Amino acid sequence: MEIKLIVLSLALLLDRFIGDPPLLWQRISHPVVLLGKAISWGEKNFNDSSLPPSTLRRNGMWLTVGLVAACIFAGLVIRSILPHAGTAGAIVEVVIVAILLAQKSLADHVQAVAQALRDDGIEGGRKAVSMIVGRNPDRLDEGGVSRAAIESLAENASDGIVAPAFWFLVGGLPGLFAYKLINTADSMIGHLNDRYRDFGRFAAKLDDVANYIPARLTGLLAALATSLGHGREAGRQALSIMCRDARLHRSPNAGWPEAAFAGALGLALAGPRQYGAETVEGPMLNATGKREAEARDIDAALVLFWSTMSLMTGLVIAASLVGLFVG
């Protein structure tokens, strides 16, 4: 375990300060893009609307299981090869883990929304936020754009960083690869619309299971980071709102980090949202909080995000040092 903690510590630092170099991924496909292509291929070949719902559910289940198994196998193969490469193998493992984390890329995309609102007004904000959320941005005002960016930041703090880190510690590279496949499948086919309701059902449920612990850990880390940065009362407020409102969210997991961010920032988040022609109803988290969010609230959310990531990284580094000296 101490080796995985050291690898994760270095990967978190590498991802934080370097992130995903655009020039690299312009030349080769990012691993998540490759996962997406595999899922897209399976969806095109096995999600036939003429089939009965039970068959679609079965097809979606076997596609997801098959791809997860392939990811686990790939992780096992790479894990068996790397030790024979010595120091180079250790460096490669750190780089692989860093590539599958998303601290800097997530923060950069969210910061772009705040900057677009300042520079180009509502139209710029809508365009920027459309890069990170699936909802229809055309009907969003400045408050809606800002809330959408903050909600995406909170949810993806779990999905994009805490959960991959958690599953790497649990299962090494096979666990990390499997999680990234599950999460990518959920984002692509785990929707409650006519096209994916049956075919993507298994992927969505599996993602709920995979993110159950990480989502709650993310909320707790955000509340603790708030306490460390703004005092115990602010931290208690974030924790209280999270425990009270997290289950109001339509997702069994996203509500935990989103409610923690809502309580920490004094904002009302979530609520009704538009996905294409579909309106998804839902209550607000921290309903008495500020609803007319703006660019400076995105800035505050980014400060909270980085505080949360710093806390997690510090805990991982501390655990790795304890493992080295005690073990």
Swiss-Prot record:
One of its GO terms (molecular function) is threonine-phosphate decarboxylase activity. The chain crosses the membrane at residues 61-78, 80-102, 160-182, 300-322. GO terms for biological process: cobalamin biosynthetic process. It is a multi-pass membrane protein. It is found in: Cell membrane. Keywords: Cell membrane, Cobalamin biosynthesis, Membrane, Transmembrane, Transmembrane helix. Its main location: membrane. This is Cobalamin biosynthesis protein CobD. The lineage of its organism: Bacteria, Pseudomonadati, Pseudomonadota, Alphaproteobacteria, Hyphomicrobiales. The gene is cobD.
